[in-house]
Curated annotation (Swiss-Prot):
Residues binding NADP(+), per UniProt: L46, R71, D96, N123, Y211, K215
Organism expressing this protein natively: Aspergillus flavipes
Record gene name: ffsI
Protein name as catalogued: Short-chain dehydrogenase/reductase ffsI
Enzyme Commission number(s) from the entry: 1.1.1.-
Active site residues according to the UniProt entry: Y211 (proton acceptor), K215 (lowers pka of active site tyr)
Length: 340
């Protein structure tokens, strides 16, 4: 396994994105024959391109977590046409990451219908241009990118662990993260009362910052889930595809979408290039456990992941996440403890 890229903590910049666009990751060649791969948000962009690669590399079963079954069917048909994989390979399961009930239903289906899951790629994410609450009462990016992603990860851990034990080699749980987590100012997340509450407040919402904030919080979640899992059974990591020409800004107004699209056109990777990182992240060894996978390397995360203050805030936030999820499901902490 490669060592860290640099001792400099992760941070985004135009020059870094330019470099990344000129140095795309290697295209994975690992065979996924005999493997069952789960991916959320595979309808478009990075998720679609990653799913396409998994199919082309011979995955025996692909589980698609999709909000829209109609769009899921379109993606399935497209991938089958391009890879000639059998219709029995791709399975569509409905998943609305804004709904706890939908997440629970999805996890139950996965656990009951599939004997094994060798890798789960938690790719679904949003970048809302305006403040909006989820049905569960949280700001939408906070809900989907952080709270719901944490919940789904915890619900999938037992299946991943059982698969790893039976196979005699670790499975993979991948959080799709972002180098933007390194740009977050500590003042935006520091709150003695509640970090969740602070990030959830409409008065604190700035669409230009919220996505990066949620990606920092997701990094914290990833590290704590990794701490709860044995790397010999489940390798948990975060993967950053860098700035990509993807559908992430699809909800932006035309005034916002135009400059966003222009920047991505000039210094962004293609969705196909970015998806290579999502695929290679589930081929990493135990040294990548709890790590930040970027540019085909284990990179150094941002300061608020590695510093003493960041770790202290991370502990506070993790307790808040567990408190929130335990209200929905009293078995959350038990599921984590059984994986450690």
């Amino acid at each position: 396994m490669a060592e860290a890229i640099t001792s400099v903590p992760a941070k985004s910049s135009l020059s870094a994105f330019w470099w990344a666009s000129k140095h795309p990751p290697a295209d994975p060649t690992t065979s996924f024959a005999g493997k069952t791969i789960l991916i959320t948000g595979p309808n478009a962009g990075l998720g679609y391109e990653a799913a396409l690669k998994f199919a082309a590399l011979g995955a025996s079963q692909l589980i698609f977590g999709v909000r829209s079954l109609a769009r899921g069917k379109e993606a399935k048909a497209s991938i089958e046409a391009k890879t000639k994989c059998a219709p029995s390979v791709i399975h569509l399961l409905q998943l609305d990451m804004a709904s706890y009930a939908s997440i629970e239903s999805f996890a139950r289906e996965v656990n009951s219908k599939f004997p094994v899951v060798h890798a789960a790629v938690l790719n679904a994410g949003v970048a809302p241009p305006a403040y909006k609450r989820s049905p569960e009462g949280w700001e939408m990016a906070l809900q989907v990118n952080v709270i719901s992603t944490a919940y789904l990860a915890i619900l999938l851990l037992p299946k991943l662990r059982a698969t790893g034990i039976a196979a005699g080699e670790p499975t993979h749980l991948e959080f799709v993260t972002s180098v933007g987590h390194g740009d977050v100012a500590v003042e935006t997340v520091r709150d003695a009362r509640s970090i969740l509450g602070k990030v959830n407040e409409e008065a604190n919402f700035k669409f230009t910052a919220q996505y990066s904030i949620t990606k920092l919080l997701e990094m914290w979640v990833m590290r704590h889930v990794a701490a709860a899992a044995r790397s010999s059974e489940v390798i948990v990591n975060g993967a950053c595809p860098s700035l990509c020409k993807s559908s992430l800004g699809r909800d932006f107004s035309i005034m916002l979408r135009a400059p966003d699209s222009l920047m991505k056109a000039i210094i962004g990777r293609t969705a196909e290039q970015g998806s290579r990182i999502l695929v290679s992240a589930v081929t990493t060894g135990q040294k990548a456990h709890g790590g930040f996978w970027s540019h085909d390397r284990i990179a150094v995360p941002g300061v608020l992941v590695t510093s003493d203050e960041g770790k202290k805030l991370s502990e506070q936030f993790w307790k808040e996440i567990l408190d929130e999820l335990s209200k929905q499901n009293p078995d959350v902490e038990k599921l984590l403890s059984e994986s450690s």
